Amino acid sequence: MFNNSRDAFAIAQAMLGQNFNSQDESDWNKAAELLAEQKDKTNPVYVMDEVFNLMESGEYAFATYYAGDYALMADNNPDLGFCFPKEGVNIFYDAFCIPTCAQNKKGAEAFINFMQEPQVALENSEFIYYASPNVTVRENEDSSLYGNEAVYPEEQPE
């Protein structure tokens, strides 16, 4: 179980057929009830590093996890598999934000522009094992992540 509320609730909302971005309080309450039920039915581990270690070592049989972390775990344990639930998933990309109170906005913008240069974005994506929003990275056939369905699913959810 994810130790951040946004991702944990997204799982419950998908199971209930709700929109991940629902603003309806009753949707959130129903999702909270469903999450509370899992405590009695499973042996939940909430610290993601612990889940990572238990999955990578083969001690746990399955877990909900981030695609990029799965890709890293699979490099160390080829017996691991990955699937998307039929209820759906949220697509995640790391993002950069500049606070409105930033003292060096131009420097922050220059850094973001640098990180989105094709070669830099490719190296960053391969280092962290996560999808890049940069199309040149996703379509780069020389990338170690090219064709990795966990990181770049063929069929995008609606």
Show the residue positions of the predicted features.
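Extended hydrophobic/aromatic segments used for targeting, binding, or gating
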Residues: D79-F84, G88-Y93
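A ligand-binding cleft/hinge motif common to bilobed small-molecule-binding domains
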Residues: E56, F62-D79, I128
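Solvent-exposed loop/turn segments at secondary-structure junctions
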Residues: S5-A8, G68-A71, G88-N90, Q103
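Extracytoplasmic ligand-binding site segments that recognize negatively charged/polar headgroups
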Residues: M1-E56
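Structural recognition of the beta-strand scaffold that forms the well-ordered cores
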Residues: M1-F2, A10, P44-V45, A61-Y65, ...
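Sec-exported extracytoplasmic/periplasmic mature domains
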Residues: Q13-Q18, A36, D40, E56, ...
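Mature extracytoplasmic/periplasmic domains
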Residues: N90, D94, P99-P157
